[in-house]
Amino acid sequence: MLKQQSTLSLVMIAMFAALTAVGAFIKIPLPLVPFTLQIVFVFLAGCLLGGRNGFQSQLVYIGIGLVGLPVFTQGGGITYVLQPTFGYLIGFALAALVIGYMIDRVESPTKKHFIVANIIGLIIIYAVAVPYLYVALNVWLNMKSSWSHVFLVGFVNSIVADFCLAIASALLAERLYKVFRSARAIKLVQIEKENV
């Protein structure tokens, strides 16, 4: 039973890692920080997979990119940690963890729960990404940039769109959550029948 449940979880983790990779290539080029749809799948991973599995889906995505597969917006490889935007990827993993943890704590999450969780996840992403962007530009890339410039390109340019995506993802998650919960329930019934 445990083995079959973990197999289902692994499939979901792999699926959301792949979806996050796909989201990296649906982008609008902007200075330093391109706008992508990755964040949608981060929100959905947290909302639908829960804290642990949502977090793991983003770790898998990051791991695949760091070993060399070009799944990030600007390629892949271990040196990608030096990219100014790598902080967003760290933020993605932490956001999925916190979003999932918040949803996991509610027995029957509502639209409000998903929206609040996603907004908090969005805050976490930017809280990690903007300082990382500043340090990357000023320390190891030696591209002297003021906090105001970093705040503009790393936050102001994309926060409105990301906020809208957080709300839209929450509304979608509310509907999909019931489907995911039903699928898990059906799977458990099948497993119980097999064990009878």
UniProtKB/Swiss-Prot annotation:
Give the stretches traversing the membrane.
8-28, 30-50, 59-79, 81-101, 114-134, 150-170
Q: Where primarily located?
A: membrane
Domain of life (superkingdom): Bacteria
GO cellular-component term (any) = plasma membrane
Please name the Pfam families in this protein's record.
BioY (PF02632)
Task: Give its localization.
Answer: Cell membrane
**GO: which molecular function terms?**
biotin transmembrane transporter activity
Tell me if Kinase is a UniProt keyword of this record: no
Q: How does it sit in the membrane?
A: Multi-pass membrane protein
Described function: Probable biotin transporter.
PANTHER family in the record, alphabetically?
Answer: BIOTIN TRANSPORTER BIOY
Homology family: Belongs to the BioY family.
What's the protein name?
A: Probable biotin transporter BioY
Q: State the organism named in the record.
A: Lysinibacillus sphaericus (Bacillus sphaericus)
Gene name, please? bioY
